[in-house]
Structure formats: structure tokens, C-alpha cells
């Protein structure tokens, strides 16, 4: 409990930001779902066959896993709030639509006949007594939708829409139960609060209910005003990073350097996703900059993959020229350290089976179980390369990056992929096996951005190239350890390092 409170106090500012994002997304989704579902239900009430079809279709959408729905929208809408909002609205429509139709159909037919006898139009009947009588049932559907929205909105973090899910995702990545609890408990409390508020509104008069939702819409609009005004004052760059502490540290370094040396501001989007996710987001303009590694560019982004040597300078030149020609992306100068892929095993396993090189795994491939990330498992410079170059046919379970270290620590797996600067190698006493057949190319990190952005702001090259040739492997490993193991803020670690190196004044 003490650790939970300390973590909450340390990250209170981040929590307020995440809570605000979650509230904005949830409230906007709920209001849009109400505006779509209730008028549709009023229309479908008099078209029973069509109503059955629409309800079935809406119900089918609810059976689609939310993560799959988000993934389907990314190619069409990019990343960020729009695909998250669209997916959440689709999920929220069904309970509101169903309850509104049920509520309207449950009205005593004699009241309908009396209204017609008094010469009331359909709209007058709806306004005078049908909606008021059906309102308790309608509000019940709205409450169900609200709870559903708030819970599902935690997944919006995976596509860059922010929210309380960022704490959960970060907690999983850092193996930090306090962060997970902060995100989960906040989401649960928010759902309970929404449910209570809507329950109170349910008992109010119709005009009071409408006024309540109008007030919500007004407050929602006002909450977006500061961000819109800030964007007009200064150009804001979106700097994203892959999952893990290292990309977040590098992204914060870029942000700090840009804000000190230019008139622009920058927002960091950490734990944004895998390589392909960030690459597509960059090309579509959903993000502006992210740190990418030379070997990843040559092996995964360039199509077809060029044949390169294992000389770092040559790999960088091929990556820089190839990505510029293929996608009109600018790849600035790399840092010094190599963060290559690696295959690691616990030291006691290495000693027990005499494992020193990746080739040595051949003699134990039937005895040991491997845990790889989805990305490593599908890459030519990953498990596919282990199969083709080393002839390995390992028993592989795929999992999220942070979970593989927990799995190897608990003994569920004995082999894992890693990055050579991962703090977990030291934390869990792992031994990196020698890449004796040189499967993994050099991996040096450098900022990747659109050529159009660099042409518009040429000062970015000068500012970000101050990191070129800087940061050794031991320094990067230590920075990762501070964030991943000691739990320090990536922004603070990045700031302290830049100040120590004389790259940042304040």
C-alpha cells in the first residue's frame, strides 16, 4: 500500500492527464452514441422487421473483440482518438438502442390511442408522454453503455489515444503492480461515479435530464479549448516510441532538445506499439518523429530487404538512403551504442547445458521452451532467421515484451529474445548467447521523420544531431535500469543525462 501511494504521488501529474483524456474520450463517445441510438430507435419502433435486423447487426459488432476492431480501423483512420472513438461508439450503441426500443414498445397501447383521439401528432405524443415514460429504461441502457465505454476505453492507449490504460500498459511493461492498480482502480472508480450520476439523473424530470447532458456537452467542449489554443500559439510535434523504457527515454531526449533549442513544443507518446505500427503512423502523419534502429530499417522497413555487411556505417548509409527513396523519410545520424537483438537464457541454464552460442541451442531445442515477442517471432532477423540460418526449431510461445522476462524469471520459459541494452538482462541474471553466425545486423538508434518536416524545420537536424555518436552501451543500459528497474521517470532520467553531457542547460 505504501508503494502504491508513493507511486501515485510521484505520477500525480501524469494521472491527471490520463484521467482527463479518459474522461474526454468516454464522455464524447457516450454523447455521440446517445445522439445516434435514440433517434434511430424512435424510427425503428415503427419498423419492426428492420429493427430486428439492426439490433442483430449491432449485437454482432459487440461480439467482435475490441482490440480487433481498433486494429481494423487503423488502416482507414490512422491512430489516435478517431479510430478509438469510432470503435467505442459502435460498442455503446447497442445497449442504448435496445433499451430505447424496449422502453417505447412497453408503453400502454391505450395511451397511444388516447393521444391519437386527442389529435396529437406522432412528435407530440413522443414529446408529451412516450419519451418520459420510457426514460427509466432508456437511462438504464445509457448507464450500461457508460460502464462499457469506460472499461473498454483503456485499450485506446494501444493506438495512441491516451487515457488510464497508459498506466496499465506501463505497469505491465515495467512489471510494476502499483501502476497497474492505479490505472485499473481509477477506471473502476470512474465507471462507478458515472453509473451513480446517471442513476440520479434517471429519477429526475425530462427537462433536468436534457439539461444534464447539455451541461456535459458544454464542459466537454470547454475541456478541449486549452489544447486547441496551445496548438495555435506554437507548433507541437508528436514524438512516439516503441514499447519499453529505452524508446521512451530517447523520445524524451528529443523533446527536451527540441523545446530548448527551437520555438516548437513536443508531446511524447511512449509505449506506442511495435515497429510496423509506428512506421505506418509516421508515414500517415499521425506522429512526427520516433527513434528507429538501423538494422530494423534494413531488415523490416525496406522492401525488398537489401543485403548489407555488418559494418555499422554502411548499414546506416543503406538505411538512410533506402528509406528516403522508398518513403521520403529523413533518417538523421545515429547514436554510438548498438542495441542489437540477442538471444538470452538464464545463466544457470547456460551452465547446466553448456550454452555459449546460439548454435548450441540446437542440442537442447527439444528440451527448452522459448518465449518471443510477436515482432521477433515474425522477423527475418528474428525467429525466422534462427530457423533458416541456425536450423533451430524451437518450441515458441509468443507474448508481450515485458511478460517474457516475467516468464523466464518464473521458469515458464528458458529462452527469450532481448535487446543488448535491456536492463532486465542484469536484473534477471541472464546470459546473452553469442551470435556466432552473425544473424543480427548492427542496430544504432536515430531519429526518423518525414522529409517534409525537416524541410519545413531544418533546425531539427542540427538540434537532434547533437546526439549523434553519443551514448555508449553501458550508459544506455544504466539509463534503462534506472527507468525499468528503479522506477524513475523516463523524462527525468533523460533530462539528467543530457545535463550531465552538457547538451541541455536547464
Curated annotation (Swiss-Prot):
The keyword Membrane applies. It is found in: Cell membrane. Residues 231-506 are annotated as: Ergothioneine binding domain. Changing residue 244 to F: Disrupts ergothioneine (EGT) binding. Binds EGT 100-fold more weakly. May have a global impact on overall structure. The chain crosses the membrane at residues 23-43, 49-69, 70-90, 148-168, 178-198, 209-229. It comes from the Bacteria. In EgtUBC the transmembrane domain (TMD) and the solute-binding domain (SBD) are fused. The complex is probably composed of at least an ATP-binding protein (EgtUA) and a transmembrane protein (EgtUBC). Probably undergoes significant conformational change when bound to ergothioneine. This is Ergothioneine transporter EgtUBC. It comes from Streptococcus pneumoniae serotype 2 (strain D39 / NCTC 7466). The lineage of its organism: Bacteria, Bacillati, Bacillota, Bacilli, Lactobacillales.
Amino acid at each position: 500500500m505504501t508503494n502504491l501511494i508513493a507511486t501515485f504521488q510521484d505520477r500525480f501529474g501524469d494521472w491527471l492527464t490520463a484521467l482527463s483524456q479518459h474522461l474526454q474520450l468516454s464522455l464524447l463517445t457516450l454523447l455521440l452514441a446517445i445522439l445516434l441510438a435514440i433517434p434511430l430507435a424512435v424510427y425503428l419502433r415503427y419498423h419492426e422487421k428492420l429493427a430486428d435486423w439492426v439490433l442483430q447487426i449491432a449485437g454482432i459488432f459487440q461480439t467482435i473483440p475490441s482490440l480487433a476492431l481498433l486494429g481494423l480501423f487503423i488502416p482507414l483512420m490512422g491512430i489516435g482518438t478517431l479510430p478509438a472513438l469510432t470503435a467505442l461508439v459502435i460498442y455503446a450503441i447497442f445497449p442504448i438502442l435496445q433499451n430505447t426500443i424496449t422502453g417505447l414498445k412497453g408503453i400502454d397501447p391505450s395511451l397511444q390511442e388516447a393521444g391519437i383521439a386527442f389529435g396529437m401528432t406522432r412528435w407530440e405524443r413522443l414529446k408529451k408522454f412516450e419519451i418520459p415514460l420510457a426514460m427509466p429504461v432508456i437511462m438504464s441502457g445509457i448507464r450500461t453503455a457508460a460502464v462499457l465505454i469506460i472499461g473498454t476505453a483503456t485499450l485506446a492507449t494501444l493506438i495512441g489515444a491516451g487515457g488510464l490504460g497508459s498506466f496499465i500498459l506501463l505497469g505491465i511493461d515495467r512489471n510494476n503492480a502499483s501502476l497497474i492498480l492505479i490505472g485499473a482502480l481509477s477506471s473502476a472508480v470512474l465507471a462507478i461515479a458515472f453509473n451513480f450520476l446517471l442513476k440520479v439523473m434517471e429519477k429526475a424530470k425530462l427537462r433536468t435530464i436534457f439539461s444534464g447532458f447539455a451541461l456535459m456537452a458544454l464542459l466537454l467542449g470547454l475541456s478541449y479549448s486549452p489544447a486547441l489554443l496551445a496548438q495555435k500559439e506554437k507548433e507541437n510535434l508528436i514524438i512516439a516510441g516503441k514499447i519499453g523504457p529505452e524508446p521512451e527515454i530517447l523520445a524524451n531526449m528529443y523533446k527536451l532538445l527540441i523545446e530548448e533549442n527551437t520555438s516548437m513544443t513536443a508531446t511524447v507518446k511512449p509505449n506506442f506499439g511495435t515497429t510496423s505500427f509506428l512506421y505506418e503512423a509516421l508515414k500517415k502523419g499521425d506522429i512526427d518523429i520516433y527513434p528507429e534502429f538501423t538494422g530494423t530499417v534494413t531488415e523490416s522497413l525496406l522492401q525488398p530487404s537489401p543485403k548489407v555487411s555488418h559494418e555499422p556505417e554502411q548499414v546506416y548509409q543503406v538505411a538512410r538512403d533506402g528509406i528516403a527513396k522508398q518513403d521520403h523519410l529523413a533518417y538523421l545520424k545515429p547514436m554510438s551504442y548498438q542495441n542489437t537483438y540477442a538471444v538470452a537464457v538464464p545463466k544457470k541454464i547456460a551452465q547446466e547445458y553448456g550454452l555459449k552460442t546460439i548454435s548450441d541451442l540446437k542440442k537442447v531445442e527439444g528440451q527448452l521452451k522459448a518465449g518471443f515477442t510477436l515482432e521477433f517471432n515474425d522477423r527475418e532477423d528474428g525467429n525466422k532467421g534462427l530457423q533458416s540460418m541456425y536450423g533451430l526449431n524451437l518450441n515458441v510461445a509468443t507474448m508481450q515484451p515485458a511478460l517474457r522476462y516475467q516468464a523466464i524469471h518464473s521458469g515458464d520459459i528458458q529462452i527469450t529474445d532481448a535487446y543488448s541494452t535491456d536492463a532486465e538482462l542484469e536484473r534477471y541474471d541472464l546470459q546473452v548467447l553469442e551470435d556466432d553466425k552473425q544473424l543480427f545486423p548492427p542496430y544504432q538508434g536515430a531519429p526518423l521523420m518525414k522529409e517534409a518536416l525537416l524541410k519545413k524545420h531544418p533546425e531539427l537536424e542540427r538540434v537532434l544531431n547533437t546526439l549523434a555518436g553519443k551514448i555508449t552501451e553501458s550508459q544506455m543500459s544504466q539509463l534503462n535500469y534506472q527507468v525499468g528497474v528503479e522506477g524513475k521517470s523516463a523524462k527525468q532520467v533523460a533530462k539528467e543525462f543530457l545535463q550531465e553531457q552538457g547538451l541541455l542547460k536547464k
